[in-house]
Amino acid sequence: MESFRQIKNNNVDLISNNDPLDKNRLLIEDLWESVLREECPDDQAERLIQLKELSYSKQIDGNSSKTFKNEIVDIVNSMDLAESIAAARAFSLYFQLVNILEQRVEEDRYIQSFTNKDVQKSPDNLDPFAPALARQNAPVTFRELFYRLRKLNVPPGKLEELLQEMDIRLVFTAHPTEIVRHTIRHKQTRVANLLKKIQIEQFLTKDEKISLKTQLKEEVRLWWRTDELHQFKPSVLDEVDYSLHYFQQVLFNAMPQLRGRITEALTENYPDVQLPPESFCNFGSWVGSDRDGNPSVTPDITWRTACYQRQLMLDRYIVATSNLRDQLSVSMQWSQVSSSLLESLETDRVKFPEIYEARATRYRSEPYRLKLSYILEKLRLTQERNNLLADSGWKFDFEGEIDNKNIDKVENLYYKSVNEFTYDLELIKNSLISTDLTCDSVNNLLTQVHIFGFSLASLDIRQESTRHSDAIQELTNYLDLSVQYDQMSEEEKIKWLIDELNTKRPLIPSDVNWTKTTEETFSVFKMVKRLQQEFGSRICHSYVISMSHSASDLLEVLLLAKEMGLLDQDSQKSKLLVVPLFETVEDLQRAPEVMEKLFKLDFYKSLLPKVGESFKPLQELMLGYSDSNKDSGFVSSNWEIHRAQIALQNLSSRNNILLRLFHGRGGSVGRGGGPAYQAILAQPSGTLKGRIKITEQGEVLASKYSLPELALYNLETVTTAVIQNSLVNSRLDATPEWNQLMSRLAETSRSHYRKLVHENPDLLNFFQEVTPIEEISKLQISSRPARRKKGAKDLSSLRAIPWVFGWTQSRFLLPSWFGVGTALSAELNSDPQQIELLRVLHQRWPFFRMLISKVEMTLSKVDLEVARYYVDTLGSKENKDSFDNIFEVISKEYNLTKSLILEITGKNKLLESDRDLKSSVSLRNKTIIPLGFLQVSLLRRLRDQTRQPPISEFLIDKDESRRAYSRSELLRGALLTINGIAAGMRNTG
């Protein structure tokens, strides 16, 4: 049997001694094998190593051979439950180590690209962006971008105008596959740091190398002995804690560095251009505020989330301020101080006599240290109040509690807004400047305050549209209107809603016992009002309406906002930005019509926030990738979103309204995922104009934000793509011929996709039986149910995340490519010469190139031999014929799609032009196969016993009659394989 090292020696395409990624994979191989040999019984360790080596040696062109499959299956089926769980843990550990390694190498490459002063030069007669366009996975840095813009003669004024208006918002969301224990996360960080030290081996002595490798092995051994799974269903606040980890550990310090890098690049290429505002890139969150289909997200949870976020920021500011106090030891004996700072010290002395008494002697000639002592006290008092608010809840009578606790000093002396904190820091900064001093730590802290404030991230409320219409229906039933709300036409609803919005009298009686659902709908708006009163409008000012279908959906939310005091009729200002989310293909097509109705309403336009120097109204619109893909397939979803953006931007321009598009992208290709740089460049010309909002799904947070340089790389990539799209993408607009071709491809692919997914009566049974979807929905991995409606088993009730997740686990990855081959084939059958046009599109149109690139990457991860095993082993006998037919349809479409993708790209094999990606995918495809077979084995055992329930909870394994085991053990094993496959695929649902 070949080992990894033998393959390394025999296959130069797989590994290279000169490649840091390949070189360090050998370190991971040795580490993994060494840990298994020390932690597992000898025969078990050798069997696991044998499984992995089999994986390396017997795979053919991305699909496992049948002979190889049988060898793996024999080993897997010979394992008892304990051995199966050990195998699942071992392979999951392996992939997590590989992920850490790849992140470290990506981090190093980014550092090299940033520190390399030699920007790739382009001949003057060529497009300066051509090299980046040719290298599909090579985003540009700030330095490269501004150099190339200068070569294109982009005027400084045009660039400055864009930078001043630039508004990039990254919104973190929760995800059911990424609930990792803090303990495991910390171990991953320590492993990454040790790898970083080992990778600078040229500076290490022999003893240092040995010591580091020993530490690394011991860390992984501790990891192996640590329970990687939660023993309980994670709460929403657990998910909040998970997402905030990245802010606390990485992003807080990364943001000043991002500003430093754009400053340096502008200074080199556009020295006269004014820097963008510090907050040109900021953050939002749905974790703790997205209540669409998640009954666990209550008003109290959202309130506590806001308090938790403020607590985190106050903790960081206290540490930073304390460090500043240590650093700013400037003495009045040797330096002047501004009069403004001295005056503020006198004011603070009166307010904080205890601080003055305690610190005045020590800092009598060190005014900055004294000022920072006062700032620290204000921050601590703000923290004290925040703790009180978190404990009290959003409904509490705060004044009474504060008086009762005899801490009314908090009321007077804490920071009532982040502006007061900013003012104090600006006093210090300006005083230093006035005496010809600068302090990077002060500047960095101010940047952090401008970006994060006290809120850290804005909480977007999200709720499904029918919750509001149902509440208004219950209200109108109580009011006994002559025509009930649900009996009104859309035009009648709009008229009635506008009339009520213009009426000052309250509509909702205060003394009615509403149903629980309606009462909670009302309470959300009341809680938002209380949040804004306490935290400021920044903490929560966007209300996303999922499944938006009509203009009345938005007006209903505005009416409820008005009733709860979030809309000022006199000034015609709304404290909520109402954001429609158009998700299905039909809703995307209808979106321009819906928004046109609203833009024609003067009352509606007057409520839109006015932004920028132009003081134009701003409308935010969200586009859903997940449900449109689930509804109509990959090509149709992407094309309808593309078309909707153009139509909505044209509509907004005609109405003199600014548009901010909110892209609801998932981590997987089937939910809009993929490289952010290519995705942003592929947006239609003229639709960004420096403004974009994007979801960052929980499943991709670790790969993007776990390491400081990786976080900077992602932030710089997004920013450069937005600037590039906004300034130069107009030269890459599609022609009418291209648009017509794409419309035909979208329609044909949609028809073929829906024929299988929505029209084949056996597809749902196929999905439920041959993927782990039912087990996924039962596992303790998310606070959010897998289905929108409790107990429902139909496809429409299933959420997009588990839909994609199930297909990914079983190696079909169907939502990301099915229908593409049939659409391309139909086009070529009608005119074989169209292949040349398709190749031109692939070379010249970022949108089409992005589509083909995503399909190619996804196809490279499909393994039909493994998928076939899921069908044969998990499919019921009575469904064998229909399931075989479905598999044949899928297999035929896969082969057709693959052949046509290769023909368009001019390649012989998938990914052959991207060596790094090909190497990574090849390694994963090989090593992940045993996990798939392990998963099938565990699912088969579990389902066999479920069909014939035993008397007790403990089940006798027919392959292991000597011991009993419980359903919980089987579920545990299944969860370990699910997590392992998710880690191996690097994108899940």
Swiss-Prot record:
It is an enzyme of class 4 (lyase). GO terms for biological process: carbon fixation; oxaloacetate metabolic process; tricarboxylic acid cycle. Its cofactor is Mg(2+). The keyword Metal-binding does not apply. Pfam families: PEPcase. PROSITE patterns: PEPCASE_1 (PS00781), PEPCASE_2 (PS00393). This is Phosphoenolpyruvate carboxylase. It comes from Prochlorococcus marinus (strain MIT 9301). The lineage of its organism: Bacteria, Bacillati, Cyanobacteriota, Cyanophyceae, Synechococcales. The gene is ppc.
